Design a protein with these regions (language model features):
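HotDog/MaoC-like acyl-thioester-processing domains
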Residues: 1-8, 86-176
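Hydrophobic, proline/glycine-rich low-complexity stretches
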Residues: 1-106
Length: 176
């Protein structure tokens, strides 16, 4: 039905400033200076930074995410109001660490629907996969599998089964 539906690819970009703000905003301690100081010889992107790129895309200003995505309809899918969605789970696979800035490169977000599941009166589960890819080389940097739950928006007659996955985190150790 709607499983496998692919949204149009979208460009993503970031600056070193974005990487620094992210590391500071999630409370990286000073002991991990290689995430917090852009002149550190091993300066690198914190591994979970790719999780925000589907929200940020190329914006350098505050993002009104819901307005931007209001027209992202999925053929045959129920009309869910994603303003009420909450994170259910995320699985992040890192194939290659992101560079500290996307300047000089071109990256894109490829987003597809794994499934939308009717959970009855409780609501619906929305399962997606986001891939960050170098648009020139085709090299995949990260894949994120996200399941969001949309409360009180169920009973639309869709499939009820959601396959539960195990979440694995692998962090890259700075070299040097």
């Amino acid at each position: 039905m709607f499983a496998g539906y692919k949204f149009a690819s979208q460009e993503v970009s970031w600056l070193r400033r974005d990487v620094l703000l992210f590391a500071n905003s999630i409370g990286i301690p000073a002991a991990d200076l290689h995430f917090l100081y852009e002149l550190h010889p091993r300066f690198m992107v914190f591994p979970t930074y790719p999780l925000i790129l589907p929200f940020k895309l190329t914006d350098q200003e505050v993002v009104e995410f819901y307005d931007r995505n209001a027209t992202n309809t999925i053929p045959g899918a129920p009309d869910l109001d994603l303003r009420y969605a909450v994170d259910g789970q995320r699985e992040l696979t890192i194939y290659k660490p992101l560079p500290t800035a996307s300047t000089g490169s071109k990256f894109e977000l490829q987003n597809k629907v794994i499934g939308i599941y009717d959970k009855g009166l409780a609501g619906s589960a929305f399962d997606t996969e986001q891939v960050i890819v170098d648009s020139v080389t085709g090299e995949v940097y990260t894949t994120t599998r996200s399941v969001s739950f949309v409360p009180k928006q169920g009973n639309w007659g869709g499939p009820r089964v959601l396959m539960v996955t195990t979440i694995h985190f692998t962090l890259f150790q700075a070299q040097g």
